[in-house]
């Protein structure tokens, strides 16, 4: 499957308010195809690519800052394992309240995982556009731009979000938000919930992109690691989809 189709699928699986924040892959491809070798064409491409990278970076930073604030404030539920255990214990007879606690945690975790996949697929998209540009023009933009993204752009530096994902998963495990021994019907019910469903679908798309990509080298991202959660890991695809 071509990368453009997988990107389209990833965009459709993202949150609605995120869908205009992805790399403008189709438009950038059109600009590359129209380059005739003139300085004006090259300048137009560089300007369009820079604007797209700025858009991606600003959105990632905005979301990361929001997640840090939510994580520190532990809202809408205090993400503290002891408090969470106590809340669930007190709500043992209130199924709706327990379900609400679980859903809030799963949603927060899912939004952060979606941001990690957003970072990955946009970096890959930028890399593929640069590769197409260099192939068409004989230029050498890919290496310096990839280096600049890795060193200076926020959307490639995912350590903070990854740490919060791991901490959230630890709370989920301790509080038995969705136990490993949960029945299949419980997993299926969770998968039908909006953000959780989108998260699983986005992870599967990213696995397809990573496993099937023919683009490997010093400018490639490291392999995507799925969150260490049995209930997400169980949704991994059995085989890769080839990327063109």
Curated annotation (Swiss-Prot):
Domain of life: Eukaryota
Region (Disordered): 212-244
GO terms under biological process: cellular response to cold; cellular response to phosphate starvation
SPX domain span: 1-147
InterPro entries according to UniProt: SPX_dom, SPX_prot
Pfam family, one: SPX
Entry-linked PANTHER family: SPX DOMAIN-CONTAINING PROTEIN 3, SPX DOMAIN-CONTAINING PROTEIN 6
Protein name in UniProt: SPX domain-containing protein 6
Organism in which the protein naturally occurs: Oryza sativa subsp. indica
Lineage: Eukaryota, Viridiplantae, Streptophyta, Embryophyta, Tracheophyta
Gene name of the record: SPX6
């Amino acid at each position: 499957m071509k990368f453009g189709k997988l990107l389209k699928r990833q965009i459709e699986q993202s949150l609605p308010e995120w869908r205009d924040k992805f790399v403008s892959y189709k438009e950038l491809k059109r600009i590359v195809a129209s380059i005739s070798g003139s300085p004006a064409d090259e300048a137009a491409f560089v300007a369009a690519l820079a604007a797209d990278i700025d858009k991606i970076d600003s959105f990632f930073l905005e979301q990361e800052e929001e997640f840090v604030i939510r994580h520190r404030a532990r809202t809408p539920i205090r993400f503290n394992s002891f408090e969470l255990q106590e809340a669930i214990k007190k709500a043992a007879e209130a199924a709706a309240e327990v379900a609400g606690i679980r859903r809030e945690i799963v949603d927060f975790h899912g939004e952060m995982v979606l941001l990690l996949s957003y970072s990955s697929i946009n970096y890959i998209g930028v890399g593929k556009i640069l590769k197409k540009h260099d192939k068409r023009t004989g230029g050498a933009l890919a290496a310096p731009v990839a280096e600049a993204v890795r060193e200076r752009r926020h959307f490639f530096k995912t350590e903070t979000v990854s740490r919060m994902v791991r901490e959230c998963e630890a709370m989920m495990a301790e509080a038995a938000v969705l136990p490993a021994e949960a029945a299949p019907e419980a997993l299926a019910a969770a998968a039908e919930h909006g953000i959780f469903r989108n998260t699983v679908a986005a992870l599967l798309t990213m696995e397809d992109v990573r496993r099937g990509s023919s683009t490997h080298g010093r400018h490639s991202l490291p392999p995507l690691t799925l969150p260490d959660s049995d209930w997400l890991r169980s949704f991994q695809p059995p085989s890769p989809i080839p990327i063109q």
